[in-house]
A protein has these predicted regions:
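Carbohydrate-interacting/catalytic domains
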Residues: 1-152, 176-186, 454-457, 468-476, ...
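Conserved alpha/beta catalytic core and glycan-binding cleft of carbohydrate-active enzymes
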Residues: 308-310, 325-491, 498, 519-590, ...
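Short, flexible loop/turn elements at secondary-structure junctions
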Residues: 51-53, 77, 88, 160-165, ...
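Intrinsically disordered, polybasic Lys/Arg-rich low-complexity tracts
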Residues: 636-757
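Short glycine-biased active-site loop of nucleotidyltransferases that positions the nucleotide triphosphate
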Residues: 74, 205-209, 253-260, 377-378, ...
Length: 757
């Protein structure tokens, strides 16, 4: 139900207030906050705020020399909602609420519903009129309504607005200027979406935006609200989607913010065992309180509707779901059923997703949820949380752990490559290589890779190729696409000077090529969440650290993916082939253009009639050391029954002509027979055991008998170390900064989210 925008009267049954107190005013920002309007022919601003425990509230600012009590508000519902109209106030005027607590103290608070705010270190709210912006993204909006959200391409470039690129000495671009710089780069690189770290107003740069004080105000660090509208509008016109991080899990204790808003808990849970994250130093919302539900759901819809944002990535969902999250014994209380689940938070998330996706089914609601909580991306009506995507933190942790391992020891960790297929299709996953993985001593992505300078690039290329082919949508944090060696810092721009070195430009070219290949081949995104879009060929060659699998699209087109996670050349590597014909190599991470050796290319490979891996035929290829290869699978041709009958008739006619000189014999009518081909029989045999069993074997490799192994694949070679680095690029491989950037408080591994504290 959409709240009205009619003139509000001092009546407790007023619709906006009634819906607000029921938890159902999902456009509360239209009523609360500061709004320019005309009363009795005089222009001014009406202020409204919710403060249930206050004994008095006044509006203060430059207009009254910040004098408490000079402009007192009055209750409009005889309960908790306060209002005041001040003639003569105008856009950009700064104000706060001076709240008198029940203890008699005065606290000065920023407006929770403010559309604009002062730039830190100042923290006052500003009057702002959102109306009047001319949008130009109608074509984008209409196209999005027809988009298949789940079965479409999604390749996200995650970025921090203030440190992607700066002008001058670390002076950030404003939102509109940033769009002009960003659009050509995103289009050239081929990403489909940009995801912004939080841009809701926040006081501390080192929190990266994850400690929010203004849930309705784009941070003024980068301009005005209309500047941010221009940012989104320009990206949409360029065909680029915009996702933003949204933080409903917790908020900071800054005295001007939501904390103890009227001297007592309003927005936070009043129970100290539920209302505070001591390790993070932040407060937890009271998810069961109706007014808080209206506040948060209004905030989410505000960004989607007023700023045309395409989706929200909901931060720290795991911390909302569990009462014992980051709490020791005695620091938490069980729920009414004796469990550790936060029942109110679960109900809130379901309500949030039902509301948003009910209004906008084409929007993205992405959960950053790091536990095994079931059915995160299933509808609330089926017992799920109602998101339509979830970050795959398990895949990320396993694969980064595997890639850090020296290739000599990867054989014993092969299950980390294959284990994700135990659960890959249980949720609608996004594969995230996010900002959290390149900060606080974890090292940049390329510095996680083992080996010398060239080996690091070869490992990273192999990993990117595997990631792009793995089922699930994709996300990569800025700077990793060209191999930044230093950890990310919010205090300075990316190390763009690295693109003056060949290895970095070649890696960037490789990522650009991968992104283009991804968009052009539906097999990589059309069936991401079903076994119908994926099939193992070689899951368990742990001794040689090789995997091979198929990705398929809805039309039956297939891409064969082969990954060699060892720096060893594999000549004569044989694997099963689903279709007979010629297999064309369409991407090779070891290509010279990408910084590889360029010594091995399979170009086109013919199948031979050697059954293997459950298929009637196989191919033999050469695997470059430390590489990912993509092959185009030939289209399977199926002749129609009529064609077969015609061929049979021609064959019979030839035989008859050849025997013409012999006495004619009575010819029997040809018998129609239907035989199951060997290929069909083999396929049936393979299907019988079930795909889940195949995934199980993949995740837990077993040693194959020596005879079978020799027949199936090329003999294993002892891994060799790669060549020593070239001296030319040594300056690019700079170490992480000696002086670490400011950072939020440390956090336990349960939710790998360093930035939330």
């Amino acid at each position: 139900m959409k709240p009205t925008e009619e003139k509000i009267h001092a009546d407790p049954s007023d619709l906006p207030i009634y819906l607000f107190k029921q938890g159902n005013n999902c456009e509360a920002y239209r009523y609360f906050g500061a709004h320019i309007e005309t009363r009795a022919g005089e222009s001014g601003v009406v202020f409204r705020v919710w403060a249930p425990h206050a004994t008095a509230i006044s509006v203060v600012g430059d207009f009254n020399s910040w004098k408490p009590g000079s402009h007192p508000m009055r209750k409009v519902d005889n309960d908790s909602v306060w209002e005041l109209f001040i003639p003569g106030m105008k856009e950009y005027d700064v104000y706060k609420y001076c709240v008198t607590t029940r203890a008699g103290d005065l606290v000065y608070k920023a407006d929770p519903y403010a559309f604009h705010a002062e730039t830190r270190p100042s923290n006052g709210s500003k009057v702002y009129d959102l109306s009047g912006f001319a949008w130009h993204d109608e074509a984008w909006q209409e196209a999005q309504k027809k988009t298949d959200v789940i079965n479409g391409p999604m390749n996200i470039y995650e970025m921090h607005a203030g440190s992607w690129k700066t002008k001058g000495e670390n002076v950030p671009y404003n939102y509109s200027e940033l769009a002009d710089q960003l659009i050509p780069y995103i289009k050239e690189m081929g990403y489909t979406h940009v995801e912004l770290l939080p841009v809701m107003e926040y006081p501390f740069d080192g929190s990266w935006g994850y400690q929010v004080t203004g849930y309705f105000a784009p941070t003024s660090r980068y301009g005005t609200p209309k500047d941010f509208m221009a940012f989104v509008d320009k990206l949409h016109e360029a065909g680029i989607g915009v996702i933003m991080d949204w933080v409903p899990a917790h908020f900071p204790k800054d005295q001007f913010g939501l904390y103890n808003f009227d001297g007592e808990p309003c927005y936070e849970d009043p129970n100290p065992k539920r209302g505070e994250h001591k390790e993070w130093g932040t407060m937890v919302f009271d998810f069961g309180r109706s007014e808080v539900q209206s506040f948060l759901i209004s905030s989410a819809l505000y960004w989607l509707e007023q700023y045309h944002i395409d989706g929200l990535r909901v931060d720290a969902v795991a911390s909302m779901l569990y009462l014992d999250y980051n709490r020791k014994q005695g620091e938490w209380e069980p729920n009414k059923d004796g469990g550790k689940e936060n029942l109110e938070a679960v109900a809130f998330l379901r309500k949030l997703n039902n509301t948003i996706l009910g209004r906008h089914p084409h929007k993205y609601m992405i959960a950053e949820e790091s536990t095994a909580w079931p059915m995160v991306t299933k509808p609330a009506s089926d017992g799920g949380l109602g998101f339509n995507f979830k970050w795959n933190m398990g895949w990320m942790n396993d694969m980064l752990s595997y890639m850090k391992t020296d290739p000599l020891f990867r054989a014993g960790n092969h299950n980390k490559v294959t284990f994700s297929f135990f659960y890959a299709f249980s949720e609608n996953f996004v594969l995230p290589i996010s900002h959290d993985e390149v900060v606080h001593g974890k090292g940049s992505l390329i510095n996680k890779m083992p080996g010398d300078y060239e080996a690091k690039f070869a490992n990273l290329r192999t990993f990117f190729g595997y990631m792009m082919a793995h089922p699930g949508k994709k996300l990569l944090f800025m700077g990793q696409e060209f191999g930044q060696f230093t950890e990310w810092s919010e205090e300075k721009q990316l190390d763009w000077m690295l693109l003056g070195y060949d290895k970095h430009t070649e890696l960037q070219t490789y990522v650009k090529t991968l992104n283009a290949f991804y968009k052009e081949h539906p097999a990589f995104w059309q069936i991401d969440y079903s076994w119908e879009g994926f099939q193992w060929i070689v899951p368990d060659d742990f001794q040689q650290s090789v995997v091979a699998f198929l990705r398929k699209d809805a039309a039956g087109k297939q891409i064969l993916v082969v990954c060699n996670f060892n720096p060893v050349l594999r000549e004569g590597y044989t694997l099963g082939a689903p279709v007979s014909g010629t297999y064309k190599e369409v991407l090779n991470s070891d290509d010279e253009a990408f910084g590889g050796s360029g010594t091995v290319h399979n170009k086109s490979v013919r199948t031979h009639k050697k059954p293997l891996h459950g298929f009637e035929q196989s191919i033999t290829i050469t695997l470059p050391p430390m590489s990912t290869l993509y092959f185009e699978v030939p289209t399977k041709r199926t002749r129609k029954a009529a064609d077969k009958a015609e061929t049979a008739e021609k064959t019979t006619a030839k035989k008859t002509a050849a025997k013409a000189e012999k006495p004619a014999k009575a010819e029997k009518a040809p018998k129609k027979t239907t035989r199951t081909t060997k290929a069909k029989a083999a396929a049936a045999a393979e299907e019988a055991p079930g795909k889940a069993e195949k995934a199980k074997k993949a995740a837990k490799p077993k040693k194959a008998p020596a005879k079978a192994k020799a027949e199936a694949e090329a003999p294993a070679e002892k891994p060799k170390r790669t060549r020593k680095p070239k001296a030319e690029a040594a300056p690019a491989a700079e170490a992480a900064p000696e002086k670490p950037a400011r950072k939020p408080r440390a956090k336990k591994a349960a939710e790998p989210k360093a930035s939330e504290k």
